[in-house]
């Protein structure tokens, strides 16, 4: 299989059927595969720690959805709020009219209304769904809210060997603007509970547990460790890596996912949590409890570790692309973000031709790291901060401060396509660009 085929696989070949499914209504009277009801809830993060938010089906995270790769899937979205809402199917290669971005042409779900979406989910792996839109200064909206959940697209072939599967979904609460006009948070959670408040994850010695880690944060990158254990990373953003690695720490930017298997070989009660003590103290952790073990969960700091995408890559050299697009990232006056000197909606669209390979060069001329997300496609990391790479396929990549990251994509899913920084505050202040097919 060629590198172009690898990038094109998992959904591009089924584009015709995906588009047809999206544009045709399901049979009259047919039940949807899933229903998402958007509404206001009171979420108890811990005893005497309740907050108001908007969520799916009265819970945070929303229900874990499962779909079969290549099999049409229908979701009914019911909006019980007074605001128009949008659900984005993050990581799926589906048509723009159902992707869940207003900029691509997906219609909102009107207040107190409902809408059905039918699409063919591809590629397989850990995907997710979340509210998509602008929040501005309203820190209760969009990705600041509880509107997020895990979507597992089950492969048409064997998914691999593990004994148990555990979702780990990260989020923060009670956001506010600090003195630097950045967003900070008072409370943190994993799976909707603060450390010590939720049920522990029950495991047994000898198990191989697959942790599906999703950072559903609006703005923050997190570093996670599981005391006394290591993670064997097998997939990034739901895509298998060519070179699985055992690491003591997972670094996960907003919208990123990491699939990692842990060999349960140290009985006890341990903390899986943020390596930064202030965030653990504010709730970012969950107890991992072996059968028969008792006592308070323990924390042991991991060894120093630097997260590096290229460690999971192969040894091939990236072929020459058919075209290049360089995107220079800068911050302008008024806390606006620019790409090549322009802020959305004035950014120049990236023009591509179908079935050609393009290299996107992100040149970050700021001190902040930026998680860059491309809708409806995935890309291959070819160079990261000066280090060549191959085979690591993602839909969101962190671009470190003052560094360049290069990624290759095959333009094989025609239609308007949004690309943006997945830091909500940056997205709200111009950090977006459209990709269009010529």
Tell what function each PLM region has.
Residues 21-35, 138, 143-175, 242-369, ...:
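Extended terminal and domain-junction accessory segments
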Residues 1-14:
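N-terminal secretory signal peptides and thylakoid transit peptides that target proteins
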Residues 117-153:
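Hydrophobic or amphipathic alpha-helical targeting/insertion segments
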Residues 164-207, 214-218, 337:
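Acidic-aromatic/histidine active-site loop/patch
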Residues 17-46, 52:
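C-terminal segment of N-terminal export signals and the immediately downstream linker at the start
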Residues 60, 64-67, 91-123, 196-201, ...:
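Extracytoplasmic beta-sandwich strand-turn segments characteristic of Greek-key/jelly-roll folds
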Residues 77-81, 215-216, 362-366:
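Asparagine-centered strand-capping/turn motif at beta-strand->loop junctions
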Residues 48-66, 189-201, 334-354:
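N-terminal edge beta-strand
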